[in-house]
Amino acid sequence: SNYRMGALRPNQFGVDDAHVKEYVESVAKASGEFLEIVNYNLAGQQYAIAGTIAGLKALKADSARRVAAFGGKPAFMLVPGIDVPFHSTLLRKGVPEFRDKLDALLPAYIDYRGRLVDRYIPNLVASPFEMTKEFAAKILEVVPSERIKAALDDPAVWDSYAADDQKLGRLLLTELLSWQFASPVRWIETQALLFGKREQGGLGVEEYVEVGLGNAPTLANLGAKTLRLPEFAGNDTVVYNVGRDEGRVYMTDTDSLVSDDEPEETAAPVETAPAGGSAVAKLGSSAAADAAPAAVAAPAPAAPVSAAPAGAPSGAAAPAGAPS
């Protein structure tokens, strides 16, 4: 294959999140090679780039030149073992076949309103799933879905979908998933939605749990790094990985009720009862407290709104290894 994938850290040469897409496009244009951001993982700091071998070499050289002038650390590295331009527009020709396969495999009945509405965050649009015309329009804003366009262009066609939850839900879900594999993973926006405060349009998630291997907590690490960005200052969201933090997730760990910052009370001496009598122990309050460990609240990936992350998983917010 003539394709590879690389990871780019534009903050190491002074390019921010708002300008990284423009930067990659400029290198593609100058080199005459294909380059595309396919994973937006961590604002300003981590992006996956799909491209031709020559295109990625040009990106590596240009970023190295900029790093030298800026004084940053190495900003580009190849991702080993990948020779397919995943999540790039080059895969769009495969969307119809993938859609047909999905349609054949999805259950005949899905409780779309109960299980997906306001719970599933597709990375294609980086917003909660809805059964509305406005949500369908969001899909059409990012991909040229002929099925969505046909439904939106004709009021009678849309009304036929709107009258049947199974028909409408299946249309939206198959389009979201089939187009996702040929579209970038918008994990930066998905995390901003999850961690953002409610008064600012976010979901206000209090506890975030990655379901994945404890020795490779990709999404948990991205979440923790995102929460350290200036725009999330003061956010107290707790991030877990189900393998790494099993005790917390399943409430099998124990915490002392005594704060580490507070001195423990000294237990009173145990008095020995006379022979033939019962022993009477006078214990300090700290000993009693230690005997009753505090329960740990069960984590919920989304606070009042439970969202299932993507893809980085693809298409589902959960979000996307690096999300995919």
Task: Annotate the PLM regions.
Residues 45-50:
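A generic structural motif
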Residues 19-25, 56-68:
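Short amphipathic alpha-helices in soluble, non-transmembrane regions
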Residues 262-323:
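Long, low-complexity intrinsically disordered regions
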Residues 36-42, 112-113:
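Short beta-strand
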Residues 1, 26-36:
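Short amphipathic beta-strand starts and helix->beta connectors
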Residues 12, 51-58:
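Helix N-cap motif at beta-to-alpha junctions
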Residues 1-19, 204-249, 253, 257-258:
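FabD-like malonyl-/acyl-CoA
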Residues 68-207, 216, 225-231, 259:
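Acyltransferase
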